[in-house]
């Protein structure tokens, strides 16, 4: 990528994530930028989620978000929000495209689940008025 390239949240790039270890995604693959645009401007790294074309495996997993094949994305893919990664900008190969605002909202929901900011079961219980009593862990 050009030295003065400006990375944006929601951009999709082809990047080299290095050697895959175990179930961790690696190699050259598409990634979506999750980091805020201020960090994208100043930092030598970007926070990304890798994409996979193996979309049938665990398709309904709450940390996955499906992206249909579109301009810049040759095949339908799954965003793997459970595999958030910090990628040095020197590992970015080329720009592929950008997700829509609606798609970014869906990806954000998957990231919230991964980081524990949103737990689907608790949200459903709250919606149905079945909230559990809060537990005080300090013995009180």
Question: Which residue stretches match the model-derived regions?
Answer:
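Conserved functional hotspots at enzyme active or ligand-binding sites that engage polyanionic ligands
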Residues: 1-140
